[in-house]
Amino acid sequence: MGKLMVPKILVTNDDGVYSTGLKAAFDSVSDLGEVTISAPAVQQSGVGRSISIFEPLRITKTDVGGIPAYAVGGTPTDSVILGVFTILKAMPDLVLSGFNIGENISTDTITTSGTIGGALEAASYGVPAIAASMQVLDEGQKFDDPRDYQRERFEAGIKVVNRIARNVLKRGMPENVDLLNINIPFHAEEDTPIEITRLARKIFKTDVEERRDPRGRPYYWIAGDLIREEEEGTDVHAIMQKGHVSITPISLDSTARIDFSEIERYL
């Protein structure tokens, strides 16, 4: 009999290698294969799919709650690239990015979230990818030390991700799906309903706050209130209005699904 192949799973995040969310992500797939952690050494939220091309990168061996891990001095995308081409030296069977402390919903986050950015990088190699995020009720928690976030908040999410990851490893991704974006509501339990959703347009009402330093010179904070009401069927509605788990299938191909002759009028 041939030797049974053990799936290789790469885990990353954007909150940094020491986040409790990363350990929860590891726990969610630890029984599914050989798991390797390659994640940013420090907080990298909001960097999207950015890549480091103007400076060298370093890898430091460390541990996450007793689990061996690699801390990368770069972005989540850098962590995936080094994880695949330097640490594993092979394509994994699955990449899991998360758990992010804070929901990643709407088109706002698809291009800005480092959690999703790392998953998109993996998907670009044809590797099935999952991004997993936990809703927070206090927006300030997104900016607190991710090492201090309560581990028990991830229990329901761990079960959801385990089930989905198991099926992805078994069946592969559906046709034309490159990434599954999973968001877990704050009060999720084992029997919380799961919705397959589409992306809402926005999650933030973008605003800019101007302040003055002690010398009277202006500086600025990008800010904005959360949008909590969106159309039925969107990820924002599922999380914010219903308290349901949201799973959004994402494709790398962002080409508008239109008749291309519509564009010829502009030529």
Swiss-Prot record:
User: Which residues hold a divalent metal cation?
Assistant: 14-15, 45, 100
Which parts of the chain span the membrane according to its record? none
List, in alphabetical order, the Gene Ontology terms for molecular function in this entry: 5'-nucleotidase activity; metal ion binding; nucleotide binding
According to its UniProt record, what is one Pfam family this protein matches? SurE
> Which Gene Ontology cellular-component terms appear in the entry?
cytoplasm
What is its EC class? hydrolase
Question: Could you tell me what the cofactor note in this record states?
Answer: Binds 1 divalent metal cation per subunit.
Classify the main location: cytoplasm
Keyword terms of this UniProt record: Cytoplasm, Hydrolase, Metal-binding, Nucleotide-binding
Instruction: Give the subcellular location.
Output: Cytoplasm
Function, please? Answer: Nucleotidase that shows phosphatase activity on nucleoside 5'-monophosphates.
Its family? Belongs to the SurE nucleotidase family.
What is the protein named?
A: 5'-nucleotidase SurE
The organism's taxonomy opens as:
Archaea, Methanobacteriati, Methanobacteriota, Stenosarchaea group, Methanomicrobia
Report which gene this protein is encoded by: surE
